């Protein structure tokens, strides 16, 4: 997937979708209702919907859409995509390639790298390696490799590459929710 044509987060496409689009342009209302996830945020202001191996996906195995609760147009405020790996080194290799492209595209944006423990793994053996770009309009883009411990892999957790686009509105929600 080429990222170099985008100047604004709404110009980025993941599986043809962009921030600000209606999810109804890509999924039926039944699909949207059937794919609602349990809220993982401190409040339910935004709804999470995960879609696995959908017929129109060309690059990613899973796409995650977040929209405001009670938004009957399902306007996408956050859009994520994931690939799953048996070998974390494959994830790191693809992450590195994406970061090289993003470094060129967002050369004037603030960039941050963070390695942190996955809160679900109480042993502290699972990590996320995240590079985040802060765009001038308040939106953000993250490229993350999640490296689950062997014990979590055996429970069905797969190492994954995640590319996440967040509107300013969604980024502000997360900043307040987790401050």
What are these regions (language model features)?
Residues 4-11, 33-105, 109-179:
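Amphipathic N-proximal alpha-helical interface segments
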Residues 15-39:
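N-terminal targeting signals for Sec/Tat export/insertion, comprising classic cleavable signal peptides
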